[in-house]
Amino acid sequence: MSTTLTNKNVIFVAGLGGIGLDTSKELVKRDLKNLVILDRIDNPAAIAELKAINPKVTVTFYPYDVTVPITETTKLLKTIFAKVKTVDILINGAGILDDHQIERTIAVNYTGLVNTTTAILDFWDKRKGGPGGIICNIGSVTGFNAIYQVPVYSGTKAAVVNFTSSLAKLAPITGVTAYTVNPGITRTTLVHKFNSWLDVEPLVSEKLLAHPTQPSQACAENFVKAIELNKNGAIWKLDRGTLEPIQWTKHWDSGI
């Protein structure tokens, strides 16, 4: 069911990153009420730019590391909800691409996403009297088919797809819908220099960038289109400047 972003309150985790910042710029053009950006590193110039694009949108920044204990996330969310009262959409966008950092890759790309999602359910879950909400999780095309030289990163993104698909099926119980946006190779600092697992391919970043890529601006525009389409359970592929729904093949059914 499509949605308008006008007057919506959005929390964007990692909304100042490569794709994140361009997406934040597109979001404020949609006349949000509040854009709350959570990121590890403050960027006052970027925040000022977002405010200048559309002064009607209240843009707020809070420092946030997704690897903190879930109790810290809940505490931060209480502060945010006390200020904006309601939150309509959570975008989980934190990610690193460095298979030398195995534990941190898993902590940022998957565990942190799960914990942030779990924490906001305290405020949204209709079983607790909550109003429900929408979760947009950023995955990657590597969640469909791995870049085998970075198996840790690829594994976390496959986990994001499965976790989010489960959230979508739980919507009748929780009132919270969910979908993934999965960018292809996008020209950002994330892919300019990174490390393969056990250095199996020292030139992996150069080889990836030799393939067809997309600018982050094109990815951001399709990102916001996917948010506006608001299709529960959707698995969106954002590759080479296009937006395409993925039809997931079922090879097994739990039967429950």
Swiss-Prot record:
Substrate binds at residue 140. GO terms for biological process: alcohol metabolic process. The lineage of its organism: Eukaryota, Metazoa, Ecdysozoa, Arthropoda, Hexapoda. It comes from Drosophila tsacasi. Gene3D superfamilies: NAD(P)-binding Rossmann-like Domain (3.40.50.720). It is an enzyme of class 1 (oxidoreductase). This is Alcohol dehydrogenase. PANTHER family: ALCOHOL DEHYDROGENASE. The gene is Adh. Its EC number is 1.1.1.1.
